[in-house]
């Protein structure tokens, strides 16, 4: 999908001083993606999405350790609410924990590390550069897997794959740019919103009806997102106001 742009820039998009980080990022991203897709076959989509909500917690901890980011009270509260909502949905100890759950958890761990690496790279490289390296490296790594497991898709499946690729491209460009603009820990509470969308998609497309605990957990998660959104907008207004006062 991004190949025309790469050719248009005469491959200048690959200019970077972080080639090793790009390589490591792709090496971790591929198994994270494969594990995630595998769990979608084993578990309902809203359950897989809920499990992935451990990512914001891991990322926030890693951001403090490796990016020297500070954790403010509102971000912490939003994360606690988001994680609590996830526990309400999963109900560990009440429902059976299958191999699919463990696969989803390991995928989340790998993806958390990928996010931290992305933040480090994003300081110097553009979103399109990060995505270009990801596309090239992951295509190379996937080639060896495809040799043994290739299945020719039919017309409908091919259309779905193209749509998934387009959505994935937009997703990664947006995420990479977000990590460039703000602290990575600030972006994490917003990821909890995906549960709401996943539940809606699961209901209308796959006939997967979310249970009562899924909706209760979703409400808790949404409250956390509202808190962080309100606080960050308020902080931004204060910064703008102070900037105007200084100029005057």
Predicted regions and their residues:
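Glycine-/small-residue-enriched transmembrane alpha-helix faces in small-molecule transporters
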Residues: 96-120, 237-248
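Hydrophobic/small/kink-forming positions within alpha-helical transmembrane segments
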Residues: 26, 30-34, 56-61, 86, ...
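Membrane-interface interhelical linkers
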Residues: 1-24, 73, 123-125, 136, ...
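C-terminal transmembrane-helix exit sites in multi-pass transporters
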Residues: 38, 55-77, 196-215
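Hydrophobic transmembrane alpha-helices of multi-pass small-molecule transport proteins
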Residues: 74-90, 213-232
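Cytoplasmic-side transmembrane-helix entry/capping segments in multi-pass membrane proteins
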Residues: 16-27, 71-83, 100-105, 124-136, ...
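Juxtamembrane helix-entry segments on the extracytoplasmic side of multipass membrane proteins
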Residues: 14-18, 86, 91-113, 147-163, ...
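Helix-helix packing/entry segments at the starts of transmembrane helices
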Residues: 49-54, 121-136, 172-204, 228
């Amino acid at each position: 999908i991004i190949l025309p742009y790469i050719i248009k820039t005469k491959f200048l998009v690959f200019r970077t001083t972080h080639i090793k980080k790009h390589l490591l990022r792709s090496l971790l991203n591929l198994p994270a993606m494969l594990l995630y897709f595998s769990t979608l076959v084993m578990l309902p989509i809203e359950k897989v999405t809920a499990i992935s909500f451990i990512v914001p917690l891991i990322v926030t901890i890693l951001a403090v350790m490796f990016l020297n980011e500070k954790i403010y009270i509102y971000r912490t509260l939003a994360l606690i609410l988001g994680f609590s909502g996830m526990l309400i949905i999963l109900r560990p100890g009440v429902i059976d924990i299958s191999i699919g759950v463990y696969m989803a958890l390991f995928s989340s761990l790998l993806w958390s590390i990928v996010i931290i690496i992305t933040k480090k790279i994003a300081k110097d490289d553009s979103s399109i550069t990060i995505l270009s390296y990801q596309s090239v490296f992951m295509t190379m790594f996937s080639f060896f897997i495809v040799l043994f497991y290739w299945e020719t898709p039919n017309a409908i499946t091919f259309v779905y794959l193209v749509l998934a690729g387009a959505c994935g491209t937009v997703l990664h460009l947006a995420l990479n740019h977000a990590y460039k603009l703000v602290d990575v820990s600030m972006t994490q509470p917003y990821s909890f919103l995906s549960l709401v969308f996943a539940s809606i998609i699961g209901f209308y497309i796959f006939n997967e009806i979310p249970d009562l605990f899924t909706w209760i957990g979703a409400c808790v998660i949404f409250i956390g997102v509202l808190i962080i959104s309100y606080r960050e907008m308020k902080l931004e207004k204060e910064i703008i106001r102070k900037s105007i006062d200084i100029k005057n």
